Amino acid sequence: MISRKDAIAQIQSNEFDLVVIGGGATGAMVALDAASRGMSVVLLERDDYSQGTSSRSSKMIHGGLRYLENFDVGLVREALLERSLMVELAPHQVYPTPYLVPRLGDDGRDIALGVGLNAYDALATVGVKSDEGPGETAENETLAAAVDRTISWAPERHRTIDGAEAARMMPALAPLNPQSAYLFYDCQTDDSRLVITALQEAERYGAVLLNGADVVEVLDQRGKASGVAFVEQESGDRVEVSAANVVNATGVWADQIRPDGIEDEGEVPLISPSRGTHITLSLDDLPVGEAACIVPAGEGRRIFALPWYGRALVGTTDNDYDGDIDSVSPSQSDVEYLLDAVNTYFETDIAPEQVTGAFAGVRPLISSGDTKKSVDISRKAEMYETSSGMLTITGGKYTTWRRMGKQVVDRIVEREGLSAACRTAEIPLGLPARPEDLETDLDLPDGAIEQLAFRYGHGAREVLDLCAERPELAQPILEGFPDLLAEVVIATRNEQARKVSDVILRRTRLGLLAARDLDSAESVAEVADLMGEELGWSKKRRAEEATLWVDEARREGINPLIRAGR
């Protein structure tokens, strides 16, 4: 990415076809879709890219097996199609994972789940049906071909495996002596890194990207949205952006973008937030091995235990949330709920003190006025067009982010009378690199090469070149983890990281994996120093930024034993 300074200069000196408010997954894909169709695009993010819901997901690219319980067949089919496409477009960042549903003791086979898995298999391979929309036929031809190519990553339907194989795949099951298990496949990713990759592709097509840009007003001319005004957080300056189209892609904040005088209340969605909490655990405490496991969690609920970055990722909860959506952290009861489910199922005794990290996000569910609990509300995306012409896209799920972006840009193309087909079904999200192609004589931490290949793809070479130039940067950010100090420099120089938390929580994910080791200013002092070298911070500013990290970490609740004000 270009620097924030250069981005601001471009914004101030140009008019745009489109301004996108929100730098999460949906906003990133709107920007990429529009820019790749030839539009001039600026994307503005109030805080950091993916700082909201898009960095707090379950890290899964999946069809949503449980949505079949609500008969959301269309949503599941769409998500499964997009899942296959993401494996094609970002093979280094979206990867298949085996999922197990074990049968323990004398438990009978879950017949309903077996039926659901049969439907899941069928929906994953169903042909592509043409939808109406600008450029749709051409895209669906490409999409069908892409699905044909990528479905080979999971060539077999779900099957039943014996208990010994299940225990081999997930050692945590071994003490339980499983009789058998259903085995099926879904995909995992690093959610915030995938957003960064999409944003980099959008910039490659000409989009201008800026974080730390708080949109405070939607401008209008004769009752029509004509741009936005934002406050640049570093300087406090107010900047106006002229744009022919305005898209609100702020997710759970979508109903807060309500410009006075040019919209009716009924023209924007009413968000019903739902909080989802996750925890991470050491593999010594929960050895998940190579597989994910669906874990019963009471009252018909199920949670997941997944391998992720050398930890076991456990989640999620799904509860109505009426707190401050700008400050979402795991509740003590949610952490206890997840631990109770794990301990009950795996017959372990994992205590809160053993939790290596925790995080919570808020899903932007759209309220229908129904009294159903949030777990039963559909995750379908919705687009709203106001009398001002502003488009709002919200709801949905991470897996369908590409299609949500397409839905918005299709509408802009339609009303502008343009001829520009969607191309995002064929635009690679970064370039993959095999770990063996990145071999180096550098003395790197164990696992660093593999992690760099996953996180950056071909861009990992730039990290390694920096390590060769400055060998001290080949050291780990935190002892025992493969994340390199060079990544701090790359994040600051190339990815608009401007706070320690941007690096620790979103460019790397160390804050979610080793929260107890990163709970002091001293623990991130080297990160602050490296960022300061790039951003021109004084010694005093570097110390202040390290202290700000501690405050933010406590607000985020990444270490559930240490919270703000406690």
Named regions from a protein language model:
Residues 27-28:
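N-terminal Rossmann-fold NAD(P) dinucleotide-binding loop
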Residues 182-245:
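Helical element adjacent to the flavin cofactor pocket in flavoenzyme catalytic cores
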Residues 35-55:
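Glycine-rich FAD pyrophosphate-binding loop
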Residues 22-24, 46:
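Glycine-rich Rossmann-fold phosphate-binding loop(s) that bind the pyrophosphate
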Residues 1-18, 33-37:
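Extreme N-terminal leader/targeting segments of oxidoreductases
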Residues 59-165:
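Dinucleotide-binding Rossmann-like beta1-alpha1 core, especially the glycine-rich loop
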Residues 19-21, 241-251:
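Short hydrophobic core segments
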